[in-house]
Amino acid sequence: MSLIVTRFAPSPTGYLHIGGLRTAIFNYLFARANQGKFFLRIEDTDLSRNSIEAANAIIEAFKWVGLEHDGEILYQSKRFEIYKEYIQKLLDEDKAYYCYMSKDELDALREEQKARKETPRYDNRYRDFKGTPPKGIEPVVRIKVPQNEIIVFNDGVKGEVKVNTNEIDDFIIARSDGVPTYNFVVTIDDALMGITDVIRGDDHLSNTPKQIVLYKALNFKIPNFFHVPMILNEEGQKLSKRHGATNVMDYQEMGYLKEALVNFLARLGWSYQDKEIFSMQELLELFDPKDLNSSPSCFSWHKLNWLNAHYLKNQSAQELLKLLKPFSFSDLSHLNPAQLDRLLDALKERSQTLKELALKIDEVLIAPVEYEEKVFKKLNQALVMPLLEKFKLELNKVNFNDESALENAMHKIIEEEKIKAGSLMQPLRLALLGKGGGIGLKEALFILGKTESVKRIENFLKN
């Protein structure tokens, strides 16, 4: 088997979005799974729209999710001389030509074609032009598309695709300012980089016949193509920012783990049996682009949150502390190692993202200044206050390093007072955490410690 070489080639006119990252992941997995090469190419020939910040953000996103590319990053803006050489080669071989048609002429032609209910297209009028070029017109360069030929390629996702070359006009390969066009530079670079397999969104499917025309004109080997359907939202519509089409780095800020995001995106359009959770090593062992789905996949926040919660639960306390550094939360320095481990172990089971985990840390460690009203109103004040007073005194006798002792202290009061467990635990939870839900009470007492627990109960009694 020949060496597999893939690439990801974003345009730095905006930030890397979720669909682009999925494409990069598919290309990365295919190359790495076959001990091949994976390259990153920045398609920045549109100098008026390029953004250095966007290019850097793409690179930053790659680093975050762990997609390591081979070799140096290739910037198309540094390769204009190479493109000019190949344009000249096509001109010299009479496979391309200068077109002097003005914009006004082209617009008029399109209007005439529309009036005749024809598809607007260039009419090849300068294809065999040998006369004197009109003055004042900077020509474009057009490729001579072979006529009456059938282009056939077997797409790895879409199956066999056939296009009659008569449906393709002599498209522009260099604009009047000399800047080469997208389809031209993509073809040149994929050929010179030795790309064997192109995995990309199916919005590029219509470009493929044009690129094949160029491959053949330049006697380049045509790569294999895999055109992946787009990602839709859960209503079956194109992704919007509200539904997930945001900058990849936003997901880091929202508290998603890179392992969860990669797993999630790899499963959007690809599957292996009924398996949902894949480590990177498993993806490398199992991924095959031939298994890519031909139908669009749906972005599900529920699925992403479920996956992220899974990966969050499998992080150690020390790993979580590192991951939590970018987020703002209460100081943990007063906690001993056992309390810290207990805090993170308890909260990671109840959190779906790092951001949510950071908020829950605050909910435990910041003493409540107000109490959940609907829970507070249900309390029998005459019963609750003596119970909490008695429990507070009991806490002074308890070893707070022993969670079972803390649990026994609660059960002792419940048994002595002959009350239901909720009669003590509900007001105690409100006193400690300010609300009716949250981590277990013995966990809360252990994490807060004796001094803080007693202080919170006293503050509640004052209210």
How would you describe each model-predicted region?
Residues 1-115, 207-220:
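N-terminal Rossmann-like or analogous alpha/beta NTP/dinucleotide-binding catalytic cores
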Residues 1-11, 37, 68-74, 78-81, ...:
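Basic, alpha-helical terminal appendages of large translation-related enzymes
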Residues 27, 58, 90, 94, ...:
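Residue-level signal for inorganic ion chemistry
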Residues 55, 262, 317-325, 384, ...:
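An amphipathic alpha-helix signature
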Residues 59, 84-91, 262-265, 284, ...:
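Non-transmembrane alpha-helical segments in soluble domains
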Residues 97-98, 102-227, 232-239, 247, ...:
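Active-site cores that bind ATP or allylic diphosphates and position pyrophosphate for catalysis
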Residues 218-224, 228-371, 433-463:
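Catalytic adenosine-cofactor/nucleotide-binding cores of aminoacyl-tRNA synthetases and other
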